Amino acid sequence: PPRPTPLFHFHGLMDKNAPFEGGNGCGPGDTSALLPVPDVIADWHTMFGCQEGEEVTLLETAEARCTSKAGCEDDVQLCVFPDGIHSWPGSAEKESPIRECRGGEHVSSFSATEAIWEFFSGHELEVSTP
């Protein structure tokens, strides 16, 4: 993007539709290899001028681990779910055409909707006038 924009990425480590480590997923429409999530997040850290060094742990539970880096021009947060699949955490679990390739479990105790609302509520978009 032309300016830093907050990024909040959720990903299940057992997601076989969009594998965390990259490569080809399974399910309808999977025709191209995906980049590994750690590489994509590292690219965002570079674009946003994040400081080298340790991640800051924002949340750590049995079902979720959310991290960020210090000194970025805007927030880049990653929440991973060790047993998580390709679903929206905290939503009602639904049948899906990708069910046969999902692997792990649907995350029900973490609300992605509440987390992303809280995340973006803490950011303002500066509007420039021409």
What residue ranges belong to the model's regions?
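Flexible, surface-exposed loop/gating regions in the mature catalytic domains
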Residues: P1-P130
